[in-house]
Amino acid sequence: MANETSGRRDNRVPFRASTKTPNIMMLRRTRLLLIVCGILAFAVLGIKLFSVMIIHHDEYEKMAIDQQVRETEITASRGAIYDTNGKILAMNASVDTIFISPAEIAKNNEDPQLIARELSEILDVDYDKILSMTKNTDRWYEVVKRKVEPDVSEKVRAFKKEKKLIGVKIEPDTKRYYPYGSLAAHVIGFVGQDNEGRYGLEQRYDSYLTGSTGRIIRATDNRGTDMLFVNYEDYYDETKGNDMNLTIDATIQYYLEKHLQQAVEDYDVQNGAAAIAMDPSTGAILGMVSLGNFDLNNYQKVSDKDQEAIDAETDPDKRSELLTAAQQKQWRNKALSDTYEPGSTFKIITLAMALEEGVVSESSSFYCGGSIPVLGRTDPVKCWKTAGHGGQTLTQAMQHSCNVALVQIGQLVGARTFYKYAEAFGFLNLTNNVDSSLTAKTGIDLSGESGSIWWSQNTFYDPENFSQLAAASFGQTFTITPLQLITAVSACVNGGYLMKPYVVKSIVNGDGEAVVSNSPTVVRQVVSEQTSATVRQILEQVVGDPVDGTGKNAYVAGYRIGGKTGTSEKVAQDAAGGAKEYIVSFIGFAPADDPQIVILVLLDTPSSSTGIYISGGQMAAPTVGKMMADILPYLGVEPSYSETEKTYMDKTVPNVTGLSVEQAKAALEEVGLQARVYGEGNTVTAQLPGSGAVVASGSTILLYAGKEPSADKETMPDLTNLSYQTARDRMAALGLYIKTNSSITDTAQIVSGQTVAAGTQLDHGTVVEVTLVTSDSSMLGRY
């Protein structure tokens, strides 16, 4: 028994020992495992925290900010653009951005279809496009339309209020507005929908005109809604863009555009036109025009003619190509981007260099037999007057615009000296590569300026071939920009100084401090004061001589005007008919003894269908004359009339209403007008035209004595190619009147244009302005 008991104890002890040892080991292992797991967990957490707080700090911070705040941009106002007198040419107008918040539409159970339908109708935006936006329920900002006018925004606001919509939003914005529409369009340029400059000065100086965007930052909840009990808002002011002041004078610009557009219509100009007005003493651009024009407020719209061609095309791709081509054409600034052969206007430059070199003087004489042989040419150079001008002085050679005389003058100057002056006048830059063609630009502060194209030095200097020198002497076989020509001619008449042209006078910040300031810059003196004075005297005779002056159609009574005509044949010709195409031009300056303004007009491809002879003298010269007639009085230049001019010039109708018939007749006769009386009364009760109207000298004023003027209308006749006197009398028979803007030199001049189209219905007493040109067939030529 004892042995059995003893044996049991022996069996139990090992049993207890064997159970206790595994428990301890398991506990230890568990503790170790927990420690390891803890270490691993903390390691992972530490790594994660390191990643979040250190490695990806910026990313998670941005995510947190995006969830906790809402940021609203405040659009900065773009700087205004002013003309030289402070008239606003470009400004900002208040508009709105209409957007939706799909997240709020979903949150507030608003009707997406209703919203899409109403906004589509009000804003003229595709319904499906808006409906698709509403499905982006994770988004808070989807723009439906930008630059919405206030009256349209009010309709959206009324819809939003009526339906109590939270998800439809209206945000204030600004858009660029041009008060004068198309005025100076090619200079000012325009901005896109994003308010970034896309063309003209708006593009070139975009960084100056653009302000700094402001911001409002507010606290929001996890749904992006403003938190009700958290007063947190940061406001960062926007900074307005800098203002720009131009040298452009809006009034001068208007006169340039008005008369250039009239010339395009009168002469059926096919390929646009350009005009530039410059202050010759400073180089400041007073006006710059390129036609066809466009409205800066609707710059993508093309002309009706171009739109018809686009609408007629059925292929969408070709329609798009036509639209792009039409837009690029109308946006192109012919005044500085197009090059052309200047023709006879360049004779001014040849004259100036020859006088400066002393190879000619006012006493020099030249003989023109109608042509002149030139070394290197098979055919002789012909003058526009095939019979020749015979013997002539230097002044007469310029008055006649004689090619033969200018070839002789060019040969006296010589090829190398000619190119030396061409460089000095800014037309080319001489290089060490004598075989390369030459070019140059004025460096004006406008984008898009093209460079000239001239023959290489080796070609031009060839001692066995004078053909290039001969042609260049009268402005052919090279191309320049209109801007280069007016800059060089200004140097010829301002005392000899080549000025750098510019259009930006200054750019000022909000404190009125100039951040950009431009002033007259003398590039170099090209000719002497004496040479310049002689050039002015000779060119005044080109306009002022009523017999020999080829520029006499630029004449304006009471003013001394100098200038030169130009007619150049275009290289391209009509393939089918072989018809020649021309660019006609005129450059004039006034007053001739002390020029305050130089004006260049260029008409690209006038039509022969008008019956007016195609030449600078018949088309461009009278256009410049009309511009001068308006601009010189505006500049404060006082006219001085000769007795002959007083006889021919337009008359201002006096007020004779209330006078006796006899007194009225006497008052009209005193100012060079006649009278026709209707009625049997003794007192004038009405008159046509009314007092203050300006009419042609010798016009018949209608006086009513106890009889009422007729309310009937008259049909405007076609006066083209009628003599001044015939046109005046034909209009008088209808109770209508003409005025000439004091451009008449003799009653035999003919009408080349009228400001009111034939067939227009007019009231009795209406005054129509006409353009007069010489009727002397011996003066008709391509000069």
Q: PLM features: residue spans?
A:
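Acidic/histidine-enriched alpha-helical segments
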Residues: 129-139, 175, 269-282, 367-371, ...
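Extracytoplasmic
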Residues: 69, 74-77, 84, 92-95, ...
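Conserved helix-loop functional segments at active or binding sites
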Residues: 262-266, 324, 541-544, 633, ...
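Periplasmic/cell-envelope proteins involved in peptidoglycan metabolism and beta-lactam response
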Residues: 1-310, 339, 416-424, 556, ...
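Flexible glycine-/small-residue-rich
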Residues: 93, 100-102, 172, 189-192, ...
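Ligand-recognition elements built from short beta-strands and adjacent flexible loops
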Residues: 456, 518, 558, 562, ...
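Soluble non-cytosolic domains of exported or imported proteins
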Residues: 76, 106-113, 146-150, 195-199, ...
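Beta-lactam-recognizing serine transpeptidase/beta-lactamase-like catalytic domain environment
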Residues: 5-12, 90, 96, 223-235, ...
